[in-house]
């Protein structure tokens, strides 16, 4: 009995230490955010920037590879500046398509700075939740072929799923994070995750975290296992999501994107590095919204859905001293929520094919133009526009337009502008704190792309007007 009490006290002490450590870090970040929105912002930002460059040194981009089309030179300047100012600590690449034409393709830095391994055209990297957009494409292909409908109940293709209040959950609810299956009660091992039958039993028996259809909450990890179930049970050949994508997309169109990387290719993968405390403070000072990302898991109650997601599975860890996403065992796993491995040029080409109607019909693509769900997300507790497996960003040039795609942890992002036919893919192994437009490097690159596009469009309009006037004269 005494031993059990001692064990309980030790566990409680560990929890207190964990909470205390998180609180101290958040206090530092909180002070940084207060300074960021105060009149002292410019002085603080300049001081932090100088300190970061002094301590960690500037990154001299001496291995830039790629090109930009005429009129898009500003994108290259921003790409170089991201390194020179220390925002890119390791390596990065960006590829942009305008319809079926590459207008930007840049890469450089380090695949592994600690070992001196440079980023090359063959370097691949983990793109985290950007992988979810690829899962959404696979489901869209099966919908377009008539094998399933978004309105179908999941129990139509998976009768065992109709347990514990899940009988009315549709494929649409699952893809738009409305099913209430964001966190699992049963601890998941790596062996479980690689066992389709086991994960089938776990998800089928899981009781929803909230009444399905009433809320939307980000299914950060479970999305991958759920999409795998949808694909396996609707594909006439019964293939896993990784095999379906490889055979129907990657092999057919020559796309180097892996949902389950062959171990023989592990040497091509960049090493991911976490931001230091100094970099975290720097991000907050320049954009206090980053603090929200930190607060999602650090300030939520222990029994919150966000904490449950972070705790299970235990082998998914992104911390200062532990980053399991560098583990080759995980790289080989078919997990379409977080473990896609690719290059920016292949990621961009994949979604340019989507825009061209090469993977599923443009009629179906039109349904993805705007989010199905907006408002506060039940898990991350911030607005998270989403739908059909994609996340959305407001177009940086204003108006009511959306960019559709998916950001990933640390900055990796793919986004499509369906109106102008622009596809942007950005990947990086020096992880940042935010996602999507909260990632400074990506946001500045994205904005520069659309600024250049607007100038191109304005120039074309002037030329057309001058030509019309010349004909009239």
Curated annotation (Swiss-Prot):
It is found in: Membrane. It is a multi-pass membrane protein. InterPro entries: Beta-lactam-related, Beta-lactam/transpept-like, Beta-lactamase/esterase. Keywords: Membrane, Transmembrane, Transmembrane helix. Its main location: membrane. The chain crosses the membrane at residues 26-48, 125-143. Coiled coil: none annotated. One of its GO terms (cellular component) is membrane. It comes from the Eukaryota. This is Beta-lactamase domain-containing protein 2. The gene is lact-2.
């Amino acid at each position: 009995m005494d031993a059990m009490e001692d064990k309980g006290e030790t566990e409680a002490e560990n929890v207190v230490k964990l909470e205390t450590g998180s609180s101290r870090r958040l206090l530092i970040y909180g002070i940084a955010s207060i300074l960021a929105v105060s009149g002292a912002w410019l002085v603080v930002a300049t001081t932090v920037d100088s300190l970061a460059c002094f301590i960690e040194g500037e990154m001299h981009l001496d291995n830039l590879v790629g090109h930009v089309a005429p009129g898009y030179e500003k994108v290259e300047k921003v790409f170089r500046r991201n390194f020179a100012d220390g925002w890119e600590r390791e390596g990065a690449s960006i590829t942009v398509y305008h319809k079926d034409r590459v207008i930007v393709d840049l890469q450089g830095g380090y695949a592994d700075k600690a070992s001196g391994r440079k980023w090359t055209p063959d370097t691949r990297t983990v793109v985290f939740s950007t992988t979810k957009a690829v899962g959404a494409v696979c489901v869209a292909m099966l919908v377009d072929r008539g094998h399933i409908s978004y309105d179908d109940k999941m129990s139509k293709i998976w009768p065992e799923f109709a347990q514990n209040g899940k009988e009315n959950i549709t494929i649409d609810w699952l893809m738009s994070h409305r099913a209430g299956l964001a966190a699992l009660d049963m601890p998941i091992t790596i062996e479980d995750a690689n066992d389709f039958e086991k994960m089938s039993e776990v998800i089928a028996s899981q009781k929803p975290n909230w009444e399905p259809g009433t809320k939307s909450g980000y299914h950060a990890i479970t999305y991958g296992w759920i999409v795998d179930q949808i694909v396996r049970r609707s594909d006439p050949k019964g293939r896993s999501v990784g095999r379906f994508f490889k055979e129907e997309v990657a092999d057919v169109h020559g796309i180097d994107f892996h949902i389950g990387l062959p171990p023989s290719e592990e040497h091509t993968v960049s090493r991911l590095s976490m931001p230091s405390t100094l970099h975290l403070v720097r991000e907050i000072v320049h954009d206090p919204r980053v603090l929200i990302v930190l607060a999602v898991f650090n300030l939520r109650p222990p029994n919150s859905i966000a904490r449950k997601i972070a705790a299970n599975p235990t082998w998914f860890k992104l911390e200062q001293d532990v980053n399991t996403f560098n583990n080759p065992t995980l790289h080989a796993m078919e997990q379409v929520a977080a473990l896609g491995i690719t290059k920016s040029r292949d990621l961009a080409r994949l979604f340019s094919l989507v825009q061209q109607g090469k993977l599923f019909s443009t009629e179906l693509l039109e349904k993805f133009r705007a989010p199905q769900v907006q408002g506060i997300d039940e898990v991350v507790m911030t607005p998270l526009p989403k739908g059909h497996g994609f996340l959305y960003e407001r177009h940086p040039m204003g108006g009511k337009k959306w960019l559709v795609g998916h950001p990933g942890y640390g900055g990796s992002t793919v986004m499509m502008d369906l109106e102008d036919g622009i596809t942007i893919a950005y990947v990086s192994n020096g992880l940042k704190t935010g996602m999507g437009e909260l990632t400074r490097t990506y946001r500045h690159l994205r904005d520069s792309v659309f600024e250049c596009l607007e100038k191109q469009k304005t120039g074309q309009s002037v030329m057309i007007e001058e030509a019309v006037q010349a004909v009239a004269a």
